[in-house]
Amino acid sequence: MIVKFEVYFDSEYWCAKGIDDDIFTQGKTLDELMENIREAVELHFP
């Protein structure tokens, strides 16, 4: 499964918003954001 995200920096956090799915997460670093994206996708699609 491929889930696409729009990723942006909002002056304090890296944010990711699902393009076709209602998923949103954030992280202080890109590495933390990637971990949070994986977790959010696993929770959204059990």
Could you describe each region identified by the protein language model?
Residues 1, 35-46:
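A short N-terminal helical cap/helix-turn-helix that marks the beginning
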Residues 8-17:
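Short aromatic-glycine-(Arg/Gly/Cys) micro-motifs in beta-strand/loop hairpins
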Residues 21-31:
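A short, exposed loop/beta-hairpin motif centered on an aromatic-Gly-Thr core
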Residues 10, 31-32, 43:
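Short linear interaction segments
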Residues 3-7:
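Conserved acidic segment of CheY-like receiver
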